[in-house]
């Protein structure tokens, strides 16, 4: 009986923490969108596809032999290849900053996306480069990612989520 009460209390506390974080998350997406001139709902859609809105998410990218080639961090799954530049700019000290500060993570994701859109234009292939990169042979992967983001965008826009 005590165990189930503790479990129920834990669920309520966790649920409350998640509810409290939703307005904060909305603020982060709105702020980043305004700063980098990107639709905040698009950023939220990308974060949902990238991490299921989990600020502690860590993704491991592997080669064909299963070796880890890079890691992605936080809501926007910022790839570790960006860390040296972000350190040099004084934006973060290490990858833990990407996990501990979700708003910073969203700002960095919006910055990366804005750089991509400036480089290759405002189109779905270019949006897909956020996840799949610019390599010529990654065109199909870019479009798969873009379709996922578009589907999530339409779902969020319709209020279904």
Please name every model-derived segment:
Residues 27-161:
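Catalytic glycan-binding domains that act on GlcNAc-containing polysaccharides
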Residues 21-23:
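N-terminal signal peptide c-region/cleavage motif recognized by signal peptidases
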Residues 1-12:
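Bacterial N-terminal signal peptides that target proteins for export
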């Amino acid at each position: 009986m005590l165990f189930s009460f503790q479990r129920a209390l834990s669920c309520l506390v966790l649920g409350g923490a998640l509810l409290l974080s939703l307005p904060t998350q909305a603020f982060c997406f709105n702020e980043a969108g305004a700063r980098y001139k990107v639709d905040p709902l698009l950023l939220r859609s990308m974060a949902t596809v990238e991490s299921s809105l989990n600020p502690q998410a860590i993704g491991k990218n592997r080669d064909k032999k299963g070796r880890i080639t890079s890691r992605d961090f936080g809501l926007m799954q910022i790839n570790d290849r960006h860390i040296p530049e972000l350190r040099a700019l004084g934006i973060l000290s290490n990858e833990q900053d990407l996990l501990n500060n979700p708003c910073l993570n969203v700002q960095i994701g919006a910055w990366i996306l804005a750089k991509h859109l400036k480089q290759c234009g405002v189109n779905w292939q270019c949006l897909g480069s956020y996840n799949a990169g610019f390599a010529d042979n990654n065109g199909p992967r870019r479009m798969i990612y873009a379709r996922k983001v578009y589907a999530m965008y339409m779902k969020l826009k319709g209020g279904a989520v």
